[in-house]
Swiss-Prot record:
NADPH binds at T10, G11, S12, I13, N120, E122, G201. The keyword Transferase does not apply. Pfam families: DXP_redisom_C, DXP_reductoisom, DXPR_C. Catalyzes the NADPH-dependent rearrangement and reduction of 1-deoxy-D-xylulose-5-phosphate (DXP) to 2-C-methyl-D-erythritol 4-phosphate (MEP). Keywords: Isoprene biosynthesis, Manganese, Metal-binding, NADP, Oxidoreductase. Belongs to the DXR family. Coiled coil: none annotated. This is 1-deoxy-D-xylulose 5-phosphate reductoisomerase. It comes from Thermodesulfovibrio yellowstonii (strain ATCC 51303 / DSM 11347 / YP87). 1-deoxy-D-xylulose 5-phosphate binds at K121, S147, E148, S172, H195, S208, N213, K214, E217.
Length: 381
C-alpha cells in the first residue's frame, strides 16, 4: 500500500487524486494533506481520509481548522507544507499547489529524494534547471501529472532518446479557438472560463484561453525530457483525445490517447509502474469519428510566443514570465484588465527585465518578486 501526501488537496488536481484513492482503498493510504485556506473542504477530507499530517498555508485558516479538528496536529504556513513534502514515510508526494507557491515545497521534496507526481508546472517553469540538477544529486523520481507530459512520459518510456526527433503537445484551443483578434478583445472572465473540454482551476483555465498554459507546458517539457525548444511543437486538437505525438527520426509517430479526464494521468502517477483499471471511460469510436489538428495562430494568441521567448532567453526570464502572467490573470479575473491586455502586461514586464543567471531558489524568488511588482505597477495598482 502506497502512502500518499497531497500538496494542494482542496484544488482540482487534489480532489481528483482523492477520487482515485477513494476507489482503491487497498492500494493507497492518505498520509498527509496540505491546502492554502479552504478550511471546510479540508475538514471534510480529514474526516474521510484520516491523514496523520495536515498543513494549512494561511494563518487565519489554520487557526480556524485547529478549532474544528482537535485530535490532530495541524501545521502552519509554508514551513508546515514543506514538512509534509519531506516526510520520510511517504511513498509519493503529489505536488498540486497552484502557481509559484508550489515551488519551494516541490523543491524540498526533490532535495529529499522523494518520488514526486508533479502537477505544479510553475515549479519547472520557474526553476527547471535547478530542479533537474538537485534531482540528479538526490535521486528524486519525477512523474509528470499534466496530461500532455504524462502522455509523452508514457510514449518515450524505454525509448532511446537519439531516435526522438520532436515532441508535439496538443491543446484544445480553449473557448476562443478560431476567433479573430478583434473578436476576443472584450471577452468577459466568465466567457474565458468556459473551457470546452477540461474542468480545471480558474488560473489554468484562463491560461488555456490565452494559450499561455501551453507555453508553460513547452518550458516544462524542455526540462522534463531534455528537449530543445525547437524540438517541442504545439498542435491545436479540439477533440482533446490525443494528448501528445512523439515524432521519431524515421518519420513515424507514437500517440497517447484517452478521453479528456485528469484522473487518468493522476492515477498513473500514483500507481506507476502499475496501471489501475477503469479510471476513465474508453473512447467510443462510433462517436469519435474525426480527429482534427491545426497550427496555433500566434498572432491571435501571442502568449504562446512569449513562452518560447522566455525559454530561449533562459536564466531568470521564465520565472518573470510566470509571475507577470499570474498577476495579469488575477487582474483580468477581477475585472481590472481586458483579456488582450494580459499579453501586453507580460510583454512589458519581460521587456523591462534584465536577465540574470539563477543558481539558487532565492534568486528565482527574487526575479518572481520583481516581476510581480512590475506587473502591478503596469496595471496601475
Amino acid at each position: 500500500m502506497k502512502k500518499v501526501v497531497i500538496l494542494g488537496s482542496t484544488g482540482s488536481i487534489g480532489k481528483n487524486a482523492l477520487e482515485v484513492i477513494r476507489k482503491f482503498p487497498d492500494k493507497f493510504k492518505v498520509l498527509g494533506l496540505a491546502a492554502k485556506s479552504s478550511v471546510n473542504i479540508l475538514e471534510e477530507q480529514i474526516k474521510e481520509f484520516n491523514p496523520q499530517y495536515v498543513a494549512v498555508f494561511d494563518k487565519k485558516a489554520c487557526d480556524e481548522l485547529r478549532k474544528k479538528v482537535k485530535n490532530l496536529e495541524i501545521l502552519k504556513g509554508n514551513e508546515g507544507i514543506c514538512k509534509l513534502a519531506k516526510l520520510k514515510e511517504a511513498d509519493i508526494i503529489l505536488s498540486a499547489i497552484v502557481g509559484a507557491a508550489g515551488l519551494i515545497p516541490t523543491f524540498e521534496a526533490v532535495k529529499e529524494g522523494k518520488t514526486i507526481g508533479v502537477a505544479n508546472k510553475e515549479s519547472f517553469v520557474m526553476a527547471g534547471e535547478l530542479i533537474k540538477k538537485q534531482g540528479k544529486i538526490s535521486g528524486a523520481k519525477i512523474i509528470p501529472v499534466d496530461s500532455e507530459h504524462s502522455a509523452v512520459f508514457q510514449c518515450i518510456n524505454g525509448c532511446n532518446k537519439p531516435y526522438i526527433k520532436k515532441i508535439w503537445l496538443t491543446a484544445s484551443g480553449g473557448p476562443f479557438r478560431g476567433k479573430k483578434s478583434y473578436e476576443i478583445e472584450n471577452v468577459t472572465p466568465q466567457e474565458a472560463l468556459n473551457h470546452p473540454k477540461w474542468k480545471m482551476g480558474k488560473r489554468i483555465t484562463i491560461d488555456s484561453a490565452t494559450l499561455m498554459n501551453k507555453g508553460f507546458e513547452v518550458i516544462e517539457a524542455h526540462y522534463l525530457f531534455d528537449m530543445p525548444a525547437e524540438n517541442i511543437g504545439v498542435l491545436i486538437h479540439p477533440q482533446s483525445i490525443i494528448h501528445c505525438l512523439v515524432e521519431f527520426i524515421d518519420g513515424t509517430y507514437l500517440a497517447q490517447m484517452s478521453n479528456p479526464d485528469m484522473k487518468a494521468p493522476i492515477a498513473l502517477a500514483l500507481s506507476f509502474p502499475e496501471r489501475l483499471p477503469e479510471i476513465v471511460p474508453p473512447i467510443d469510436w462510433s462517436i469519435t469519428t474525426k480527429l482534427q489538428f491545426e497550427i496555433p495562430d500566434t498572432e491571435v494568441f501571442p502568449c504562446l510566443k512569449l513562452a518560447y521567448e522566455a525559454l530561449n532567453a533562459g536564466g531568470s526570464m521564465p520565472a518573470v514570465l510566470n509571475a507577470a502572467d499570474e498577476v495579469a490573470v488575477e487582474a483580468f479575473l477581477s475585472g481590472r484588465l481586458k483579456f488582450k491586455e494580459i499579453y501586453k502586461i507580460i510583454k512589458k514586464v519581460m521587456d523591462a527585465h534584465k536577465i540574470v543567471s539563477v543558481s539558487s531558489i532565492e534568486e528565482v524568488l527574487e526575479a518572481d518578486s520583481w516581476a510581480r511588482k512590475m506587473a502591478k505597477k503596469e496595471i496601475g495598482e
